Structures are given as C-alpha cells and as structure tokens.
C-alpha cells in the first residue's frame, strides 16, 4: 500500500499562503513530496503531515527555522531543528526548537559522554544525506543516536525538517520518538 497526498492551501497573511500536504494511506500515489524522511515514516506506518513553504535565501541571518516560523505563522517553539554533534566516540543528533540553541554539555550528558561539539557542516551533510537547512532527523543516510528536547512533549504536534529547505513534517512528538528510537532530555537553551 502506498501513500496518496492531498494538498490544501491555507491563507496566512494578506500576501502569503501555506500549502499543506496531508499524507494518508491509499492504494494509489501521486508521488508528490517524497523524501527519505517521508519514506521512513510511511514504511513505519507513522501518521504525519507535510508542510511546504517557499524558501528564500535572502535574510537568512536568523536561520532556516525562523524563516519557516515566520512564513507559516507558527510559534518558533513548535518548529524543531536537527543538529549533528560529535562526542569524540560517536556523532549524535540533537533536536531543539529553532528559537533556541543546542546545549552541547547537556547533549553529551544525555548520551553518557564527557563533551560534545558541533559536527563539521560538510560531515553533517555527508552523513545525513541532507543539505544544511534541510537536515531531517528521519531517513538519514547514517543512523545516529538521537535526543529530542523535552520541550517538544508540551505539544500535540511539532514540525521537523522533511529533508529539504521549505519542506517540513508535522508529527506528534511521541510518534517521532518511536520512529527514531530516540530519548528526551533538556538539551535546549533560550
């Protein structure tokens, strides 16, 4: 059984709109919006929605996640970024709200390491298979141990990258934890 997609456009501001692609199980597929992240969720049978917006490379000083929050009209605390860190022994993924920062010391403690540093951006792209600004925690080329910031549990649905810029996945945080076999910890700072 494959997935079919239906698209609905929601007005946001007077001059912008957001396109939501709702995934549902079906015998037919249109082949739209398929990334390794969506394929991983479909194979696992986990419910999710995809949200698309027009990405602009202008004004990126605040980062890709803040751009998503602004264009979608959502609280940046509900949109999460995926960051790859290196503990020396292994690389691990930390998922934190786009409005905050990854606390590397807390991430290291959460995985039982003494310290952690941000992975080289080129290595992050190579190991995940995604471009910066589009790194999804799902469907990565190399699977890493993953920690989700515990603030995600306050929401019934959060957004993470769907595997490319301008393409996010809306998912229940418990479902995300299940899909990733991840743990939670207070790894975000504001």
Q: Predicted regions span which residues?
A:
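Extended, low-hydrophobicity, polar/charged segments
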Residues: 5-190
């Amino acid at each position: 059984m494959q997935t079919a997609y239906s698209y609905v456009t929601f007005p946001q501001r007077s001059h912008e709109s957001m396109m939501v692609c709702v995934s549902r199980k079906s015998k037919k597929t249109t082949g739209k919006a398929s990334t390794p992240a969506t394929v991983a969720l479909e194979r696992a049978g986990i419910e999710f929605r995809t949200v698309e917006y027009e990405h602009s490379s202008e004004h990126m000083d605040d980062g890709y996640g803040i751009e998503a929050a602004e264009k979608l009209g959502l609280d940046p605390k509900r949109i999460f970024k995926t960051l790859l860190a290196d503990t020396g022994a292994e690389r691990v993924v930390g998922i934190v709200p786009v409005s905050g920062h990854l606390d590397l010391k807390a991430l290291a403690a959460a995985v039982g390491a003494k310290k952690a540093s941000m992975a080289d951006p080129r290595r992050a792209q190579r190991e995940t298979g995604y471009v910066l600004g589009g790194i999804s925690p799902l469907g990565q080329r190399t699977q890493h141990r993953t920690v989700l910031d515990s603030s995600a549990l306050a929401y019934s649905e959060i957004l993470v990258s769907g595997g490319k810029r301008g393409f996010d996945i809306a998912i229940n945080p418990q479902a995300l934890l299940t899909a990733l076999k991840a743990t939670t910890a207070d790894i975000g700072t504001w």
